[in-house]
């Protein structure tokens, strides 16, 4: 809040309630925000000042394992020292202060003059977590590192009564990748994350039960942790208020939330791109992205999602081909696509708005002072309040998890259409691409897995914050459950990655199938045309035959017929191709009139020789076209290379995921693993942004 002084009075600025600042944070596009996050994530140094920390920086330190160096702004030292000195001076004066001379929480009526001993007892009784054997009950190192960074940042603002040297020690642990072991469970994030943060304090004070992880993953005690980190000053004897300053904050919940939201923002952009690629391989109608439709709805998330998809689809080679296909027999085809495609901007837009709002809420939280009491040196007083209540975390994470579940539901709906040959405009059932469909079930198992992922994701979407229990002798009778909600949202992010991986690999399989489809169709058309010219053009005496007019209509049959409906046995009489080719010749024969009675001009009599020659030639040509495709030398190039979605396809291929066929030993899951690991390592980020590098941030003009 801006404050100016005039005539000795403190006057509030123009935005005393901070609504204006909150609204200003949402200026600009979501994509630009994500680009900025990525840029911040990749910076080598995170400098903490107390007020400018970003979720991307938290993620960088959390995931970096010391690669992103943490520096503390020297400008913060004086303020931190002033509050620390104030506490000591108040103790010397005999001032009665909560957590300094009093007990804690519901037992704050107790009094003591042993301030240092009180802080030791605080850390000891809060060491109530359970680790068990193994690591399943230990907070992941990335989450702990995030919490450490956030706690330093909030304490740097100088309202907490803690020494600057303690904050430097935490930063050193981060930079040396020495990570205290914190319990996974046991906090209600009000009063802050007391139990887990007490284990950070335990390392700093050298408690014998404290453990830490080293860079190689081994577990060591506090003494070894300090030695490996190069902290030669020894363990800290906590001064009055310092233990409370360390544990009474929301850093664990907000730290995990920061990691979660960094990944969620990226996955939201991926969902937009996958929807556009889905439109391409499904031969959809891009009209659903027209700006006027979305302008009339007014919601910015929807407008941007549509504009992103519109940009990908503009000039797409697939969309040009789809337009020609839709122009054939338009009255026999659906006028519009199903909801999973047609309303994808309307579906994704609100989720992106929720994710953006949650991101800004958490960024406010990680830059807040959130312990109690707060030391106001300027007014010479300690303020007793409740900034440790992590409600912004619990609410933001519940909302984010709902948004993630909605994105996952859309992906599942789109994937279900993609693998279903009743809906996918000619792609084979299960996206199977082998020569024998009876021995190739492609993505059938993947669809079952997607149903499982989606179900679990929807179960996780249930809110955490409506399960509050009164705690600590009814002193903490309402509490945020912030870390619990953050942890559940982290689980949801992991599942959405599984779904995004499966869907992306499926879409790339569909891209390859469209490529194969074009080459097979080209081979069929050429073969039918050649056979028609040889058999149907001339009569027995060298004269032009009435059947020569069949060729054009025979080619139309091939254009209209789905290739994969007959590709495994193109001349089978039970498949539609041969049936419809014969029907063309029969129709011409019926229209041949009296000429049909003359054996020299009869079209009926050409059917047998036409079919026999076709049966001799077509299977060989189809197999040759398939072999050329598999050898990387197809007659027709893959049109994905002319599309803005190409970088995503290229990414999948470059990580080693290939074209799945029934003849290969490799399973779908093996291909998914390659892409999943790459996504988890952040390798999909640049290809995603490359898809949108030409976008100017605005929809196409309405004209």
From Swiss-Prot:
<dbReference type="InterPro" id="IPR001106">
    <property type="entry name" value="Aromatic_Lyase"/>
</dbReference>
<dbReference type="GO" id="GO:0006559">
    <property type="term" value="P:L-phenylalanine catabolic process"/>
</dbReference>
<feature type="binding site">
    <location>
        <position position="342"/>
    </location>
    <ligand>
        <name>(E)-cinnamate</name>
    </ligand>
</feature>
<dbReference type="InterPro" id="IPR022313">
    <property type="entry name" value="Phe/His_NH3-lyase_AS"/>
</dbReference>
<comment type="subunit">
    <text>Homotetramer.</text>
</comment>
<feature type="binding site">
    <location>
        <position position="472"/>
    </location>
    <ligand>
        <name>(E)-cinnamate</name>
    </ligand>
</feature>
<comment type="similarity">
    <text>Belongs to the PAL/histidase family.</text>
</comment>
<dbReference type="GO" id="GO:0009800">
    <property type="term" value="P:cinnamic acid biosynthetic process"/>
</dbReference>
<comment type="function">
    <text>This is a key enzyme of plant metabolism catalyzing the first reaction in the biosynthesis from L-phenylalanine of a wide variety of natural products based on the phenylpropane skeleton.</text>
</comment>
<dbReference type="GO" id="GO:0005737">
    <property type="term" value="C:cytoplasm"/>
</dbReference>
<dbReference type="GO" id="GO:0045548">
    <property type="term" value="F:phenylalanine ammonia-lyase activity"/>
</dbReference>
<keyword id="KW-0587">Phenylpropanoid metabolism</keyword>
<keyword id="KW-0456">Lyase</keyword>
<feature type="binding site">
    <location>
        <position position="336"/>
    </location>
    <ligand>
        <name>(E)-cinnamate</name>
    </ligand>
</feature>
<feature type="modified residue" description="2,3-didehydroalanine (Ser)">
    <location>
        <position position="191"/>
    </location>
</feature>
<dbReference type="InterPro" id="IPR005922">
    <property type="entry name" value="Phe_NH3-lyase"/>
</dbReference>
<comment type="pathway">
    <text>Phenylpropanoid metabolism; trans-cinnamate biosynthesis; trans-cinnamate from L-phenylalanine: step 1/1.</text>
</comment>
<feature type="cross-link" description="5-imidazolinone (Ala-Gly)">
    <location>
        <begin position="190"/>
        <end position="192"/>
    </location>
</feature>
<feature type="active site" description="Proton donor/acceptor">
    <location>
        <position position="98"/>
    </location>
</feature>
<protein>
    <recommendedName>
        <fullName>Phenylalanine ammonia-lyase</fullName>
        <ecNumber>4.3.1.24</ecNumber>
    </recommendedName>
</protein>
<feature type="binding site">
    <location>
        <position position="475"/>
    </location>
    <ligand>
        <name>(E)-cinnamate</name>
    </ligand>
</feature>
<keyword id="KW-0963">Cytoplasm</keyword>
<feature type="binding site">
    <location>
        <position position="248"/>
    </location>
    <ligand>
        <name>(E)-cinnamate</name>
    </ligand>
</feature>
<dbReference type="InterPro" id="IPR023144">
    <property type="entry name" value="Phe_NH3-lyase_shielding_dom_sf"/>
</dbReference>
<dbReference type="InterPro" id="IPR024083">
    <property type="entry name" value="Fumarase/histidase_N"/>
</dbReference>
<feature type="binding site">
    <location>
        <position position="444"/>
    </location>
    <ligand>
        <name>(E)-cinnamate</name>
    </ligand>
</feature>
<feature type="binding site">
    <location>
        <position position="372"/>
    </location>
    <ligand>
        <name>(E)-cinnamate</name>
    </ligand>
</feature>
<dbReference type="InterPro" id="IPR008948">
    <property type="entry name" value="L-Aspartase-like"/>
</dbReference>
<keyword id="KW-0585">Phenylalanine catabolism</keyword>
<dbReference type="Pfam" id="PF00221">
    <property type="entry name" value="Lyase_aromatic"/>
</dbReference>
